[in-house]
A protein has these predicted regions:
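C-terminal nucleotide
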Residues: 2-10, 16-18, 26-29, 34-80, ...
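Short, low-complexity, charge-dense intrinsically disordered segments
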Residues: 81-88
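Short glycine/proline-enriched loop/turn "hinge" motifs that connect secondary-structure elements
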Residues: 88-90, 186
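Short secondary-structure junction motifs
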Residues: 91-93, 157
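Conserved phosphate-donor
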Residues: 95-97
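DPxDG-like acidic metal-binding loop motif
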Residues: 110-134
Length: 316
């Protein structure tokens, strides 16, 4: 049995989506994590992260904090409290190989949300071992993968990346302790391209800077939060790209201002041939940029973004 899970990007709603009621527009990217299930006398997981391979079992849980968080969440939720039937059946055994090599380029992560995609893939594989299938598996995976990913991130995480990888396509996430995901259609959206920023950016450090600024400036934060949500709503309510373009540009400018306030720049240099108002930084910082191309770009540094309409994909 084999399954694949797409990557993800957050197009709009940086930082605000981590808040209760914060909106974020996300999408699934057709660069996939693969998971294969094989027979085994015990539960073992092999993780292939680019050029690095980790081996996880009960005795070597420290080999991968992410795998440990996923397995422990599955174990606690299903075999500690899910049902008497599950506890009596005992934990199933199997060998699971999770490969995220497609998310690495020259030893550097691509920025397509590999940790969330790995979390979804391994969670679905574990649930399959537990006898789940179809909509029941998908529903349970949404809950467990979110818990596991937050656990691996120290309790944080909006969930946009988990849900985008799980469901595929475009979606609007409403952030909070129990986030919600609503699929959206954007038929007028121009082709998307990404390009690299100057260096990797630590998302936890960026969020720490944001939280520190928020605590010291509650009134300014409230203004930012409301403006961010308004920008996402206007983008989603647009009937055409010219309407949505204004909301996109406003969201970009808001991100630039916030970056200056919290000390984490959202300013990203792009090639002179790109229209300035059509590109912005993605995520917390300027590690990755996105360009919405009204005309075919002639710039080799740009990488086309292929949207994955399908989330988890199973293969026999």
């Amino acid at each position: 049995m084999r399954l694949t899970v797409p990557g993800n990007l957050l197009l709009l709603g940086e930082y605000a989506v981590t808040e209760e009621g914060g909106l974020g527009l996300a999408l699934a990217v057709d660069r996939r994590v693969a998971a294969e299930l094989e027979a085994s006398s015990s539960l073992v997981v092999e993780g292939r992260w680019g050029e690095r391979t980790v081996h996880w079992n009960r005795e070597s849980g420290e080999a991968s904090p992410l795998i440990t968080a996923i397995v422990e969440t599955w174990r606690e939720q299903l075999y500690s409290q899910e049902s008497t039937k599950a506890r009596e059946a005992g934990e199933p055994a199997g060998r699971i190989i999770v490969d995220s090599s497609a998310f690495f380029e020259g030893g550097r992560k691509s920025g397509f949300g590999s940790s969330a995609a790995v979390t979804v893939a391994l969670t679905c594989a574990l649930l399959h071992l537990s006898g789940f299938s179809g909509s029941r598996l998908l529903h349970c995976a949404a809950r467990l993968a979110l818990l596991a990913h937050r656990r691996a991130q120290g309790g944080r995480g909006s969930g946009y990346d988990v849900y985008a990888s799980l469901y595929g396509g475009f979606g609007c996430l409403v952030g909070g302790a129990e986030p919600s995901w609503q699929a959206v259609e954007l038929p007028w959206l121009p082709p998307l391209y990404i390009f690299r920023g100057p260096a990797s950016v630590s998302t936890p450090n960026s969020l720490h800077s944001y939280e520190r600024w928020k605590g010291s400036n509650p009134r300014e934060w409230r203004s930012f939060f409301e403006e961010s949500n308004q920008g996402v709503r206007r983008f989603l309510q647009a009937d055409s790209w010219p309407q949505a373009r204004r909301a996109f540009t406003a969201s970009k400018e808001l991100g630039l201002r916030l970056g200056e306030l919290i000390g984490v720049s959202a300013r990203i240099e792009a090639h002179d041939s790109l229209v300035p108002g059509l590109h912005k930084a993605l995520g917390a910082g300027n590690e990755l940029g996105i360009y919405l191309a009204e005309d075919p770009p002639d710039e080799p540094a740009l990488e086309p973004v292929v949207v994955a309409p399908e989330g988890v994909r199973w293969q026999s």
